[in-house]
Amino acid sequence: RNISKGVTGFSEMCRTMGAVPGAKTIKIAIEDPTEKDMELMHITPDKKILVLERIRYADEKPVLLEINRFPESFSFLFGENLNDTSLYDVLQNHNIIFDHSDKTLDIVFASAQEAKILGISKGYPLLRIESTIYNTDCSLVQRCKQLCIGDKFKFTI
């Protein structure tokens, strides 16, 4: 089941692999935008963004740290239970439909904080996937950075 053309979420990928997806919210906050947020979301420094960080699990094992950045209009997410659920399903229930995304992939090494969150050693290689996700009007809906333990999860892009 594709919830939108060209964009596949973590939960859907897990199910396709025969794994049970899970999620634990570790942060949800309204913050000042970064320069990149302002550039991609076409917002000014006086605007705010919503930041959502979650640990993603496959069969109850941590495999990915997910950092999502949304326009402040997504503050309705504060009222949602975002643990053990598909974020894309939650957004779809709010009539937010994804159309396409741009992705950049590279290898990075886990910081002490990332290593602690994911249960790995500092310096462990991670696959970093940075995505900008757009709706059918080609408006940016979400920026997402995923740090994936490459030997524990396989991405289909």
Regions found by a protein language model. Give the residues of each.
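C-terminal regulatory/effector modules of DNA-binding transcriptional regulators
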Residues: 61, 73, 80-81, 88, ...
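Generic secondary-structure microfeatures
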Residues: 56, 69-72
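HTH-adjacent hinge/linker in prokaryotic transcriptional regulators
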Residues: 1-51, 67, 75-102, 106-109, ...
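Hydrophobic beta-strand positions
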Residues: 55-56, 133
